[in-house]
Structures are given as structure tokens and as C-alpha cells.
Amino acid sequence: MGASIALELSKNGRKVVVIDKGGAPGAGSTSASSAIIRFTYSNFNTILMAWEAAQYWYNWSDFVGVEDPDGMAKFVKTGYLVFLTEGYDGVRQRELWDQFGIPYEVLSPEEVRKRWPAFETGKFYPPKSIEDPAFADDPYDQLSALFDPLSGFMDDPMLAAHNLAHAAKSHGAEFFFHKEVSGITKSGDRVTGVTLASGESISAPIVINAAGPHAAKINRLAGVYDEMKVHHQPLRQEVFSPPAPVGFRLEDNAPIVADLDLGQYFRPHMGDLLNVGTTEPACDPLHFIEDADDWNDQVTVEFFERVMLRLARRLPDFGIPLKLLGIGALYDVTDDWIPLYDKSSLNGFFMACGTSGNQFKNAPLVGKFMRILIEAQEQGIDHDVTPLEFVGEATGKAINLGAFSRLRSEAVTAGNVMG
């Protein structure tokens, strides 16, 4: 997010300084992202945002505008399959996709198996703990699915962040790594800059919080956290990269899969691997973190076994590996799993946070959102009173930025990483 914002603002003539505690662009949560580009969200604004952002990923080099000597991230088109199960029938999704011109198919269980024979299309709902005696029960019905052919993933999310940062630098942006913000300076009701743990101070009339899992801490330093109606905090997650079974590799045209029936998502990856995570089913405990600098970034046997055994139910030929292959990472999760792209009660202090593990795909638009929020405040427009809109280039339809306000009522969403 920070690199996207830096590019948009520097490209529009602003002097931009990026402070990052990490060692490189995208070295934090971005590097652990599954980097999925999909349109399966819960409401008008979030689906429209994802569809508009996808157009930039499809033409990534054109969007970035500057060739990165380290290489350019690439979009891998796989399509996206969502099994239709309890609590998700896809009807609202299809209505909105029809409005935006997003193509899709509804596939019967037989059609799913014909296209991808690796699947078991049986229904296991609800998702269960592996300690539950019913976990091994046979499926009791069959699942149809919703498939869109235009989704996919970026092959290297950290490289994508590097591409954005490199382009921002070409427009004059400066990046400082291994630097930690320890304070937000103010004069009255206006931000004046930041102080660093090293003792340095940086003066700035505009400060944007895009600190990922550290963002709640920064909002507290600014004194704006308590006035927010929607809050956010770090959530620990694990994502695994086991070998893919024969029949479900990139060469087999395997899709990205949202399996809410078992509480997981997975996709094919390069090197005959899978990328597997969870959709936070009710049977799984959530591990919120108090301090984003003090947590276990190693995968755990408990999490690994749970995810692998569920995956084997959907892909019967999947061989559960003996070695723990994966990473621990942090989401910055809001109360409703919808992000915060907003101003604050402190003039000049803005936030692009609460990305909830599902916003990598929208990074190309976030810089544009923040630019118009800043410009509106400079023009005396109160976004809290008169919510701004962003008109998408692809559809000509308006995204209501009030949907991402810190003062919104909690949105009705999937209540998990699906958003």
C-alpha cells in the first residue's frame, strides 16, 4: 500500500518520504501475501474496487510506467472457483457481477469434476476441527460452484511492491528503511510530522499511516484510534506451500479455490506447489496479537495438520507432507474485514490500513484513493460529511469512499478474509 501511495503522490508532483521499519519494499506482510486477484466480495463498492484494480494488474507494466531493472511482477490467470454451500449461494455476487460485466459460470458438481477431476465435490459443511469425531464423516451432498475465468494471482507480491517503489523513486520519492516511527508531532489539531526511534524528526504537513500490522499502534500514537467506530488489530495467520497433487497444478489449469464448505482457500503455485490458507471458520480460534513486534512467525504443527487434513478432503490425491512448509504472517484486521482508507480527526493525518488480508489486489487503486482524500481536505471538503467518490476507468461507475470510513457502521460481510 505504501509504495502505491508513494507512486501516486510523487507522480502528481508531491515530495514524498517513506519511512519503513522493514528492510525493503514489501518485506513485511506483503511478502507473505497469496497475492490473489479476485472479485468475490460482499457488496457493491468492494466488488467494484477489486474489478477496477484488476485492470491495472492485467497491464502491470503500463500501470507502473517505469521498467524495474530487478524485473516486473507478472499476473498469472487461473480463474477463481467458489463452492456454493451454507451461507454462500453466490446470488448477490452474480447480480453485482452482471452489473459490472464480470463473466462467470455456474457449474454443477458433475461439471466441476469433469473440468478438474482432482476435486471431491462432496459437501462437508460446517467446517470442523480435526478433533471433532464428525471430521471424518462422509460427505452428505454434492456442491455446485461459481467460476470466474479472469481471476488469478501475481507471481511475486514483494517484487510488485518493489516495482511500485522503484517507479516512485523515479518521480523523486525517497525511501528510508530500518527506520521506526516512535511519535506523531502536532500543532493544535494539525499533524506536523513524525519522530523516529533514532531521535530524528521529519516535518510534514501530511502523514499517511500505511503501516500494515503496526498501523493500530501508529493510529494510537496520533491520538485518533479511540474516535474510530471501526477498529483494527493484528491477527496471526499461517499460509502453507505443500506439493500439489497430480491434476491440480498450474499446468493442469487448476483454479484458485474458495472452499467455505471446509473453511479454506488454496491456489496453484509455481514449482508444482500449492498455496493454502484458511477462511477463519468458526471452529478455529483466532490469534490476535497485542504487539506486532513480538509474535511467533514460525508455522505450527497444530495449524499445519488442520489445514492439510482439510485440504485432503477436497483433493483426495493430495499427499500430506511430513515437513512443515509455510510461513507465519500477520493480517491487520478490522471489525468487519473491510479496509480503512480515510482521513482522521487530526488534520493532515490519513490512514490506509485495516487491510484484513484481502487488499493486496486493490493496491493500484489505494494510491488514487489517498490522493483524492488529501486533495479534498486541502480544498476544504469534509469527507466525513460529504463522502467522496472515485469513478472507475473501466466501468465508469462510482466507488463510494465512505464505505471505507473509520466512522462507518460495521458492514455486512463474510466476516473473514473473503471480505
Residue spans of the language-model regions?
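Hydrophobic/small residue at the entry helix of a nucleotide-binding pocket
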Residues: 1-2
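Active-site substrate-recognition segment that forms the wall
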Residues: 7-11, 15, 35-37, 59, ...
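Glycine-rich FAD pyrophosphate-binding loop
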Residues: 10-30
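C-terminal lid/capping helical subdomain adjacent to the catalytic/cofactor pocket in oxidative enzymes
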Residues: 12, 106, 345-419
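Dinucleotide-binding Rossmann-like beta1-alpha1 core, especially the glycine-rich loop
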Residues: 35-132, 263-264
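Flavin (FAD/FMN) cofactor-binding and adjacent substrate-gating region
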Residues: 86-171, 176-177, 183-190
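FAD-binding beta-loop-beta segment adjacent to the flavin cofactor pocket
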Residues: 119-138, 317-365
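Mid-domain beta-loop-alpha active-site segment that forms a flexible
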Residues: 146-166, 212-214, 261, 299-310, ...
